[in-house]
């Protein structure tokens, strides 16, 4: 569950290292799950990269440390909360995605993120 003020690691090579969620998009939602879009502010960034500290960005949640239950009864949980920074068309701004992503990303039609990911769980 990703609430406003939650810190997430960035799982791509855009230059941002950590973002803080400031809004979960989609109506009057209190928290975000895997596959949801959030608005975040960059809190840590690598120098001389396209995304700078204090930039406001859109991101897709790809990993959460909260256990989620799948339709087949299996439970899955990750070690961290992570997101991939996207543009307004929901295409990733980076060219690489680090770490595994959940299968729910594919179900929500973020196929470009899935194709860049090294592993889909």
UniProtKB/Swiss-Prot annotation:
Keywords: Chloroplast, Plastid, Ribonucleoprotein, Ribosomal protein, RNA-binding, rRNA-binding
Highest taxon of the lineage: Eukaryota
GO molecular function, one term: structural constituent of ribosome
A GO CC annotation given for this chain: chloroplast
Any single GO BP term: translation
Keyword Chloroplast: yes
CDD domains referenced in this protein's UniProt entry, alphabetically: Ribosomal_uL14
Pfam family, one: Ribosomal_L14
Compartment annotation: Plastid, Chloroplast
Assembly notes: Part of the 50S ribosomal subunit.
Family: Belongs to the universal ribosomal protein uL14 family.
Role according to the record: Binds to 23S rRNA.
Name of the protein: Large ribosomal subunit protein uL14c
